[in-house]
Amino acid sequence: MKTGEDARGEGSTGPQKLGLCVLCGLPAAGKSTFARALSHRLQQERGWAVCVVAYDDVMPDAFLREASARPLPSQWKLLRQELLKYLEYFLMAVINGCQMSAPPDRTEAMWEDFITCLKDQNLISSAACEAQSCYLLTKTAVSGPLFLILDDNFYYQSMRYEVYQLARKYSLGFCQVFLDCSLETCLQRNGQRPQALPAETIHLMGRKIEKPNPEKNAWEHNSLTIQSPACSPEASLKLTDLLLTALENPVKCVEDNVEQKETDRITCSTNILHQADQTLRRIVSQTMKEAKDKETEGPSAHHQENQHTVGTTTLVS
């Protein structure tokens, strides 16, 4: 792994280093406080540009109450995917060194909150055209390494995997930080909030949450669990190492090919088993039909044979 000096990108003529960090954990685990502190430290100590996207600040207020461990309503899920699309538009502008345009299909209130989020962190400036639909990137956004920290519960693995797919699409660094906080502490903190979630929601999420599992999911190998509320000096060093590793080892397209091949292999195997099952079912069905037909035809054929025998005997007599 390269040193922190290399990761700053100073004097480098290569492409800008970009990373996505998924910050996940139960509600009131301390994620937002942690994200702000991490952003400040990375800017001060590393000179990196940091963009903290707190989902609670960008998602429409009407849907914040839906952030529970129940199955995601379709509209809520679509809004999460829409926010990822906003992030992709920002990343495309950074990667291509151009203005950031607004997506044609957007939720206006959420888009405005996203723009405010970027402006407040000095990453974009005012609209660059009369239509107010494109924005200029600031020098901060393009002059060195840039880390996007996504602050949300991300309690389902599938939610985090969508972010990983975005990192893979553009060969970005990717890592996950899980804030491990006791259920009791989360409930206590939540109770002190002006807009507290129902306690049963946090209890349910505590049972449903899918923590990062690097042993099971190869794409989650760059993950770190930190005990909240305290972050020890040792954990702080591990966190820095995690972020540096992510920047210096972006997700490669070859990983996409390997995963796709594995997916294709599983699909192929599933199809073969399905075809074999269908063939077996047809054979069994045909065999049963033939057996049933024989049972139905048997007595009638035997009766006709007897009649023929009797008639022949009478004729001979």
Model-derived regions, located:
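Extreme N-terminal, non-catalytic leader segments
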Residues: 1-20, 44-48
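Hydrophobic anchor at the beta1->P-loop junction of P-loop NTPases
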Residues: 23
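Conserved substrate/cofactor phosphate-moiety recognition/catalytic segment
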Residues: 16, 32-139, 143-146, 159, ...
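ATP-binding Walker
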Residues: 28-29
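Conserved GTP-binding G-domain of TRAFAC-class P-loop NTPases and closely related GTPase folds
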Residues: 181-317
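Structural recognition of the conserved hydrophobic beta-strand(s) that form the central parallel beta-sheet
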Residues: 148-152
